[in-house]
Amino acid sequence: LATGVADVDISNQTNPGEKDLFTLKPKLLQILRTLQEVEKTRTTFTYHDVTYYLLTYLLDNENRLYENRNLDVACIGLDPLGEVFRVDYFHKIQIFRLIKAQLIPFPKIRLR
């Protein structure tokens, strides 16, 4: 794992379309499936779903992942999320780029 805050370029944070579907890299999928709200057999998600569930995970674990002195930085080095994102810490503005790296576009099926 890298030390320090994630070194992520946030200059281009355009979000995927509302209806675009993605599968997730296995480790993030495993973490999200620990949430009660996520069906254990679910395999596709929208970008909105992923951000919602990840923020739910972070809030559910805020006592472990955030220090009172700086609530803008998540300390995930000792959490499975640290292995997923390959960082020990990240600033809240970096979350979108970190999530995008975990998304695998689900092929669109075109009907003739």
Predicted regions and their residues:
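Histone-fold and other basic nucleic-acid-binding segments
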Residues: 1-112
